[in-house]
Amino acid sequence: MNQDTQSANTQQEKKIAYNFNKLQKRLRRNVGNAIADFNMIEDGDKVMVCLSGGKDSYTLLDILLNLKLSAPIHFDIVAVNLDQKQPGFPEHILPEYLESIGVEYKIVEENTYGIVKEKIPEGKTTCSLCSRLRRGILYRTATELGATKIALGHHRDDMLETLFLNMFYGGKLKSMPPKLISDDGKQIVIRPLAYCKEKDIEKYSQAKQFPIIPCNLCGSQPNLQRQVVKEMLQTWDRQYPGRIETMFSAMQNITLSHLCDPSLFDFKGLKRGQVLDGVEGDIAFDKAEIPNQPLIQDEDEQTTDYGENGMIQFKQVQ
């Protein structure tokens, strides 16, 4: 190998390392901001990270472990995988990976695959039943492990897709919440990747070379409604760059007085002569003011205040 080739290889390696460092910092920042905005993790928490073997959950676990090293509070992490007994599932991959990184883990074996195949007719989607079964098992496991938070790997794109799924097929303005409490009040579920782009997660997963396990039960089903919505959003993103970011911002800027749900806003109670603080009234007749700024902002150039010493300020329990 001549000197010019060696120099070119060195420059390429430096560029790859630089880009990976930027990507990791962006994911750390987005996860840290989501944790802070929604008070997802507090001092003394035991976070159960649900690991499926897909790119999202691997990235979630990796970033949380990374943040844990510099967090100003103490919290524990335990990784949990639900082995659903799908035919051909490589049972050795996750235990070997988790042992290699030295994280506490538990593999839960439940034949939900057999139940789903028995209950759901051939050709029908299995997602709904499979999801309910998994949820019950994971809630039970969290209780057994003494986990105070259950972390799932859903990201920003998942939340947007769910919003449109519910509008198109369910007639509801509803998405995935970044944080929720179970119906019985015993479990808190968090989604620390809520601010993360799927594109970033995909790149990070490839760079880290996670041992990905495909979901043959879900991913192989044709004509899923979620896949239709995903492709629609991807098309919009190609045709109108920046629209995905704008739509996600809309989920964080909701004006209840300009929707049509009387259970959330007292339309009947509006009387002439009233002046309501914080409610847009005749502004509704004005032409919308669109800020004159680029649709896409380079996230690497954004400045975010992480508190003292550049660390994310997790809320501490008093």
From Swiss-Prot:
InterPro entries: Rossmann-like_a/b/a_fold, TilS/TtcA_N, tRNA_Cyd_32_2_STrfase, tRNA_thiolation_TtcA_Ctu1. [4Fe-4S] cluster binds at residues 127, 130, 218. GO terms for cellular component: cytoplasm. One of its GO terms (biological process) is tRNA thio-modification. Keywords: 4Fe-4S, ATP-binding, Cytoplasm, Iron, Iron-sulfur, Magnesium, Metal-binding, Nucleotide-binding, RNA-binding, Transferase, tRNA processing, tRNA-binding. Its EC number is 2.8.1.-. The thiolation reaction likely consists of two steps: a first activation step by ATP to form an adenylated intermediate of the target base of tRNA, and a second nucleophilic substitution step of the sulfur (S) atom supplied by the hydrosulfide attached to the Fe-S cluster. Belongs to the TtcA family. This is tRNA-cytidine(32) 2-sulfurtransferase. It comes from Actinobacillus pleuropneumoniae serotype 5b (strain L20).
